[in-house]
Amino acid sequence: MKAGERALFETAFRYAEAYKDKKGNDKYAWKINMSYLRANDWEATNMDPSSDSRVEENNPGGYDAVNRYGDEDETGGNDFSNPFSARSYPGLGIFHRTGYEEQNLVDYDTRNLKLSAAFHYMLNSKVELIGASNFGTGTTVYQGENRFSLRDILFFQNRLEIRKKDDWFIRAYATNEDAGRSYDAVFTAFRLQDAAKPNGDWNRNYSTYWNQIIRPRAYALPGMPGQFSQNYNQGLADSVLAANADLIRLWHLETRGNVDQNVTGNQQPFFQPGTARFDSAFNSITSRLPSEGGTMFFDKSALYHVQSEKRFQWEAQKLVWVVGGNFRQFRPNSAGSIFSDTLQADSTYRVITNSELGFYTGLEKKMGDFKANVTMRVDKNENFPFVFSPAASVVYAPSEKHVYRVSVSSAVRNPTLADQFLYYNVGRAILLGNLTGFDSLVTVPSFIDYLDSLNTNRLQYFNVAPIRPEQVRTIEFGYRTMLKKLYIDAGYYYSWYQHFIGFNLGLDVNISSFGLPSSVQAYRVAANATDIVTTQGFSIGGNYYYNRNLAFNFNYSWNKLNVTNREDQIIAAFNTPENKFNIGISGRELITKIGSLSLVDWGFNVNYKWIQGFLFEGSPQFTGFIPTYDLVDAQINKNIPAWKMNIKIGASNLLNKKVFQVYGGPRVGRLAYISLNLNL
């Protein structure tokens, strides 16, 4: 049982029992597990300008905030900062639509329930039959392609296995899920705005109000040059407007309020959070599928997996041969809310399945102080060719204190279901899987250049080839040793990726006969790198055992991604800090005397972590820099053997430093807790 800050309450229960036959041999056993967690999650309230915001927080017309949705520049018509527009619309500049803060769109109360049960039966003295089931349900906020509110999600997994320990096994399991009442928080903000008035109308209403009501006031400011004077001085106009910055800000607030509330035709006023109108619109949107104008997920996907393995051992020759294989089938079912299993003309949904088949074999041979291992694996996804992955490793242990290892390996990563079949609108862009390729996308930087000049020759086009499996070759060196009281383990790797899987960002742009963009749609397309991508890294960790009760530990890692072709449009989404380390001290079974008091059988641990800042690449809304941060975790514990109990009191992030761990997520602070563990 565990309780702590943020209304944390967690409890877990496990019970197991085994039975023997009349001869005293193990015959069957069963176990059940249950855990429940409840807490108030940290709220994502980052109102800093997003990495894509073209203006800062002090812009009088607003800005694009990280955790405010709907204030993005989606449709254009909101930029009046060029010299001609600045003269016709003085003080208007760039403005952003009134958005919705995430805290008004999601429930931060986290709840999670997990149940599992297993039954083991010995068919004979060596062969065991296992049946197991797992169930999970919960509600939380999750960050994936967008910020999602997961409500009443369900997970089921059932496994059947027959095995002979250290000899062979046949295993089959099925995983099923149900999205429950989950929805996309970001897309919900867009739907709320659409229910009020389209973005294009909102932008036109804003500029029209400014032109008709605010412009005369601006030109009436003392010192402001006349709009139609032949020698119009833009620098003078800018200085007058800057001197009246507070007034300009008030005019923008006035304009925003007017545009949010004044409507025509089928338009509606802004849905203000906390009102019955907002609740009604919100509930309607989050209870309908995207195809019905809502943002609710439908996901009743399934995964079926079968695997078998056989081991052949020749003890005299110190040789082991392993052969095995697996078959896996994915059956996504999202009714078009996540994948491209969309509604067809005959009112049925497109059915998607995806199957994978793999075989592997390996030899392990011990020769004195050496142990060699050679393996080969072949994988086949129904949408891609066969891929072969050989590997070899050698371990040299001249003594118990020194172990050297070297390996040359290869691996394959088949494109995921999302890489193949995703079709998901996140507002700023449509995220696409990519089995067929994509032609004539416009690079985002060239489109921005084009907008400055309306010169179509500045547009740069590129194609995206169909997605294919990612292959990696890795060489690794390692060493571990025990020097008296000091244990050290260090390793270095270098990897070469061919067809590294990431994504490309591009625009599908239609240009009118007047040279103006008539439509613009942003896409994030799953893609492979066009050149070799390399990664390398080094890690070292160790423990120093001062005595049997006290130990020090440390760990450092360095990881680096290298994209050699700078013209490649790939976005790798590596999302890994280049440097990080932690150091700590721990004690166990301690005896401490304080005056006449004696505290026995207690322990503690304190750990310091440092993580270097890094670029977090997700969806267009959630790509930005995570600043460097450090944390201290601490805990004390006490064993009470007479009660069969262990008590822990501790805190993660003890100093309560509010840090971002993902871009777009909340600032995570301290979580202090007390935990009781009872073994009956």
Model-derived features: positions:
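Periplasmic-side early beta-strands and strand-to-turn transitions of outer-membrane beta-barrels
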Residues: 2-6, 10-151
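Surface-exposed extracellular loop regions of Gram-negative outer-membrane beta-barrel proteins
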Residues: 112-147, 152-156, 322-330, 335, ...
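Transmembrane beta-strands of outer-membrane beta-barrel pores
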Residues: 1-7, 19, 36-40, 135-139, ...
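Gram-negative outer-membrane beta-barrel transporters
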Residues: 366-369, 492-615
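Face-selective signature of the C-terminal outer-membrane beta-barrel domain
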Residues: 158-343, 349-384, 489
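Short loop/turn motifs that connect adjacent beta-strands in outer-membrane beta-barrel proteins
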Residues: 20-28, 125-126, 167, 171, ...
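Conserved C-terminal beta-signal and adjacent last beta-strands/turns
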Residues: 9, 16-22, 26-28, 33-37, ...
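Membrane-embedded beta-barrel scaffold of Gram-negative outer-membrane proteins
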Residues: 405, 436-522
